[in-house]
Amino acid sequence: MVFDEKVFNQRVGKAVLEHISSLLGPTSVKVINLYLKRYDTDLRLICEDPQKVSDALHIVFEDGAAFLEKKIARAAYEIFNLTPNESDSLRDAIERLRNLAEDLE
């Protein structure tokens, strides 16, 4: 079986939205995405450009971005039933998961 990046991106993006919605509520997620759209990104695009999402979160939420990034990374790790590495940046977490998914295929 060949690694399907599109499917990976969709699964992780969906899981991130569901997890963050369960923590903060769907209205909060809509507000976060509205702010992120100002920077031409969205939580659903976390796998396509995690650094862009991270940068936008830091611009919008400043110190609160670290909290959101940890929650987003945790949601992504839960897809693979992995324990999150708390020291991972958001980009590192997505890259680690992408590598794992490629190895599993």
Model-derived regions, located:
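Long, compositionally biased intrinsically disordered regulatory segments in eukaryotic proteins
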Residues: 1-105
